[in-house]
């Protein structure tokens, strides 16, 4: 796993996408960022996060197992819920994170608004200075 921080953006490469994308197990891949981990980043000034995994949060398979044991509803979408305390945006299913260096570029995001939806896809572009 690799963590890249550039100004107020953090990318988390879990290797889920290049290894598992297109396979049935993709939704179970990735490390997942919990409430505390997400809040830690937000308290450091991060306002945009991204991952190559299916979700910012832990895969449903593991969340369901944990919920069946503890019946604690706070574990469901806990990384997402950190945004209630400190606002941020996150991107999921990012392709080609493994091709990016640790720094030296700017990220530009071009979201597609879907009427009535709370989320949509975006074109995330890395811009390198010459």
Regions found by a protein language model. Name each.
Residues 1-15:
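Single conserved hydrophobic/aromatic residue that forms the stacking wall/gate
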Residues 11-130:
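Active-/binding-site microenvironments in catalytic and ligand-binding cores
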């Amino acid at each position: 796993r690799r963590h890249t921080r550039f100004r107020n953006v953090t990318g988390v490469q879990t290797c889920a996408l290049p290894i598992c994308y297109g396979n049935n197990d993709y939704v179970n891949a990735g490390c997942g960022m919990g409430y505390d981990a997400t809040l830690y980043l937000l308290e450091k000034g991060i306002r945009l996060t991204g991952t190559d995994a299916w979700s910012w949060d832990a895969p449903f398979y593991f969340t369901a197992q944990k919920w069946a044991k503890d019946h604690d509803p706070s574990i469901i979408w806990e990384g997402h819920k950190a945004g209630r305390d400190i606002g941020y945006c996150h991107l999921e299913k990012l392709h080609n994170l493994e091709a990016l260096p640790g720094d030296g570029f700017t990220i530009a995001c071009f979201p597609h608004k879907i009427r009535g939806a709370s989320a949509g896809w975006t074109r995330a572009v890395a811009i390198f200075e010459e």
